């Protein structure tokens, strides 16, 4: 794919959910294609270690796209074909935190990223 601009920037916008169950995302930014970002999702209001957790995303003007899921104990992980081999989902149950390591980012990864239980 060719781009007319010298720089193509990628944006991972993050939104927190305000309710009894809280999932607060952080770590988005603007990067060049091919670079990396790590998103975090701090969970509270439920027993984090008992639930599988997902990342989903919504690109501008498009519907929700499932990205990845990790089992309650981190032993099983599954990915959408569009991110397989580039993104890695992980969790730290001692910190009630979910992560998404995003490598080799592409323009088409630009989206709002959400974590979900």
Swiss-Prot record:
Framework-2: annotated segments: 53-69
Gene Ontology terms describing biological process: immune response; immunoglobulin mediated immune response
One GO CC annotation: immunoglobulin complex
Residue numbers spanned by region Complementarity-determining-2: 70-77
Domain Ig-like: 20-117
Signal peptide from the UniProt entry: 1-19
Annotated S-S bridges: 41-115
Function: V region of the variable domain of immunoglobulin heavy chains that participates in the antigen recognition. Immunoglobulins, also known as antibodies, are membrane-bound or secreted glycoproteins produced by B lymphocytes. In the recognition phase of humoral immunity, the membrane-bound immunoglobulins serve as receptors which, upon binding of a specific antigen, trigger the clonal expansion and differentiation of B lymphocytes into immunoglobulins-secreting plasma cells.
Annotated protein name in UniProt: Immunoglobulin heavy variable 3-30
Provenance organism: Homo sapiens (Human)
């Amino acid at each position: 794919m060719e781009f007319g601009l010298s720089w193509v920037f990628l944006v991972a916008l993050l939104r927190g959910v305000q309710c009894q169950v809280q999932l607060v995302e952080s770590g988005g930014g603007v990067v060049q294609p091919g670079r990396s970002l790590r998103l975090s999702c701090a969970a509270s209001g439920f027993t984090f270690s008992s639930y599988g957790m997902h990342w989903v995303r919504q690109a501008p003007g498009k519907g929700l796209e499932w990205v990845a899921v990790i089992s309650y104990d981190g032993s099983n992980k599954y990915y959408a074909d569009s991110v397989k081999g580039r993104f890695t989902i992980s969790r730290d149950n001692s910190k009630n935190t979910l992560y998404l390591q995003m490598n080799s980012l592409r323009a088409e990864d630009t989206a709002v990223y959400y974590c979900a239980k």
